[in-house]
């Protein structure tokens, strides 16, 4: 009954918005979307999810009609509200306000380039999926650790997020955590198990780390100057970098392609851990741009520099699991506010 009551509230709240399509258009779009994403609902749930989908469809249409460089679409999160999305998929809670502007500028390499992409160098594992577990911090941690191990040992090994969720006790498993705490666990534990030996379950469990299954070790980690995108660029030239961002907005939830810029984003209140694997400039069409619903053309005043960011929501979200986030645009969404990378 609680689930039904909750869905009834959702049904009422989303049904009041002004509709932009005919009922037939909504129904056909929802039917196609359910087939594409292999979704099914109980009879009690269908009506609420349908109305949420319609509201998200309207939001996508309104956003894309403005010709933003950010293109939204009806991705795998199109049947949930923004509140549900935030409560289920965002698991890093961090206030960076005390750090920004208080640290000495850190430079990690003297070399620089117009672009960088660790994927092309073989340092990045395929996109993973955290499921309905707020363990984003663990995926960000394994991603940067996999990159550091690759550079040191010459082999790309997929590492265990479940190991971190179960055993990194400074963190809170599926209820959230910080990448720096996870680095400290790996350092103090003298290793992290491989993904194959300690597979992901998307739930909290008992720690079952086995040293004989360790896939990588770390000696330390480095932090990027809080708020400095030039320091972050220097770090990304050294290794894939774990970053915390503000991903709370509906525009991030429904991102499909283009360069992501959200004027309402916070650079201090961060709620999602992801992995910066490179940077570049341009429209983003050469970085795996998917078929969005609008052109996503850059306006003359818009920056076309971006960070290449690996997410942990599967390949149905974004550009095959990636997002291009605005670069050198006032630290949008806090991309450089809390960034760090490990050292083998």
Swiss-Prot record:
Where in the cell?
A: Lysosome
Q: Which GO terms describe its molecular function?
A: cysteine-type endopeptidase activity
From the UniProt record, give one GO term of the biological process aspect.
Answer: immune response
Disulfide linkages recorded for this protein, renumbered to the chain, are: 133-174, 167-207, 265-333
Q: Which GO terms describe its cellular component?
A: extracellular space; lysosome
InterPro entries listed in its UniProt record: Papain-like_cys_pep_sf (IPR038765), Pept_asp_AS (IPR025661), Pept_cys_AS (IPR000169), Pept_his_AS (IPR025660), Peptidase_C1A (IPR013128), Peptidase_C1A_C (IPR000668), Peptidase_C1A_papain-like (IPR039417), Prot_inhib_I29 (IPR013201)
Q: What main location does UniProt list?
A: other
User: What family does this belong to?
Assistant: Belongs to the peptidase C1 family.
Which protein is depicted?
A: Cysteine proteinase 5
